[in-house]
Amino acid sequence: MTKLYDSTRPCIDTSGNYHLAQKEIHDVHDYEQNVELFRGYYAHIDEGIVNCQVRRRHEEDVQPYCGEPIFVSEYGGIKWAPDSEKGWGYGNAPKTIEEFADRYCGLTSALIENPYITGACYTQLYDVEQEQNGIYNYDRTPKFSPEIQERFRLAMQAKAAIEN
């Protein structure tokens, strides 16, 4: 429908790895929590290999990566709700705030330092009903100290390798 109104606007066919049609943007959701594994999933883009192809080889109907701009539209999802057993996030929850910050900054840096990643979006900004993986609480109050928030800001505002 978008193309009917503006044929110049790039479109994502299906968000999150499952591209079934001709696409203009290769959109990926990736909730890997191990920073080095995460970094490795994007280490061979110059050879035409993107993480979803490495981990989802059995899905033959999914369109392969063909050189389109790569947008990691969902990553992170790190659970932080130390006072609650309710809710969830991806992977094992960090045991300390410092571990959360290291993981957040590491995952973010892995994308920003990759010259083939054109964009990324941390999921998610706020906690929602069942998901306790936001940077802020459900009521929009900060979960983290100003010092930790500054670490997040610096990680997100680093110059991206694709800008060079």
Regions found by a protein language model. Name each.
Residues 1-142, 151:
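Substrate-binding/catalytic cleft of secreted carbohydrate-active enzymes
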Residues 153-164:
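Surface beta-strand/loop "capping" patches
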